[in-house]
Amino acid sequence: TDWSQTYDRVWLGGEYWANPMEDWRLVDGAAECQSRGPNRNIHSLTHQITNPKGKFSMEVDVTTLESLDRDGGFGFRIGVRSELDEYRSNCFVNRGLIAGIVGRELKLGDQTYALPEAADWQEVGLLLAGQPRGVGVGLRLTTFNLKSREILGEVSSIVPLDSVRGNVSLVSNYGGNGREGGGKIPSGIGSRHRFANWRLSGDAFTVTPEHRFGPLLWSMYSLSDSRSDEGFVMKISALTGPMGEADNKLVELHVKRHGQWDNLGSAKLDPDAWVATFRIPNWDELVDTPYKLIYRERQRDGSIVPDEWNGKVRANPTGRPLRMAALTCQNDYGFPYEPVANNVEQMDPDIALFSGDQIYESHGGFGVIREPAGPAILNYLRKYYQFGWAFRYAMRNQPTIVLPDDHDVFQGNIWGEAG
């Protein structure tokens, strides 16, 4: 992890999922938690421990920003997995093995080590190492002062192989049921922390760069006969995560025609919705047309990191029955609905219809924020991103219609029952 080149913003980057997104910020090259609520965490999307018989290590630099009564501590959580044991689904459970500092103790699963009373642990490093030990995994957690590099404490444990398999995450303020952690945090309790230089290595990890989610999250397009001199009109929307003031605000659209890529221009990202929309009249509806969306992420050192999202604007179907994939009510207990999403791709429909309740109030946990507008928008986007994360590949190659229903506007039964 090198956030040092990333501009300040809400969205942490395509390699991570933050719980909840609205409670995290990149500030001066580190991820800062903005809430004292429990179980605020960051999952690595590209690194999962799948080979517990291998070796691994994780290291992170931590600064305590705020520590009050009932300080929930900070550190790693490993072996995080859901019943589905799928890297996206794993992001929404709090089970796993704790390896961090809670109170004045170094904690590694069931093992603890009392830290010296005089130790300065406002800025510390944490190093977790694992390697095979008999039929289990030997773990060692070390903490040290970041400035002096003085070791403050160390604790070891041998745990079952299965207890380390799954996602790995950083946690600010262990404890409580984070999924239900919405609402106002009581005064005088909790803690906040800042994480930098998260480093992961070892053959216990499977590294999958394809798991990145963003900056371009997904796209949706439509193709419509305008019945005017504009002919067929193609509209396409590209979504990114919430970017910062200094970040690039433009998305480019390129299409492949006659074997050549043509640049059709740029569209500006809406600063609330983080959507860029293109409208292209007089579209040739008779042929399949590959497209790619490009977002060029600016770095502090002046370099540019491009991100591409590819798909196909399919020819308008004629002379046969229309093939439509119709879906509704994606509640997140089945997230990411992988069999359904895969079947839609294999079906290769002419059009996809999502007829409502793409999200529910409970999605991803951490409650609903209705005001003020800034955090409320981020709270909504975070839940909506789960929909796109699940169906992004099922939406990119055919027109997609997405209709809101009651839960999409956080008002169950708004259409009836005295709503």
Label each region the model flagged.
Residues 3-31:
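Extracellular glycan-recognition surfaces and repeat-rich motifs
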Residues 33-112:
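Secretory/extracellular carbohydrate-interaction modules
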Residues 44-50, 110-118, 157-159, 264-268, ...:
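Beta-strand-rich interaction surfaces with strong enrichment in secreted/lumenal proteins
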Residues 55-63, 123-129, 194, 199, ...:
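Residues within well-ordered beta-strands of beta-sheet-rich folds
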Residues 56, 122, 287-291:
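Exposed beta-strand face motif in extracellular beta-rich ectodomains
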Residues 58-60, 117-157:
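Carbohydrate-binding surfaces in secreted/extracellular proteins
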Residues 64-70, 132-135, 245:
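Extended, low-complexity, turn-rich repeat/linker tracts enriched in Gly/Pro/Ser/Thr and Asp/Glu
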Residues 147-190, 201, 205-419:
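Divalent metal-dependent phosphoesterase catalytic cores across multiple superfamilies
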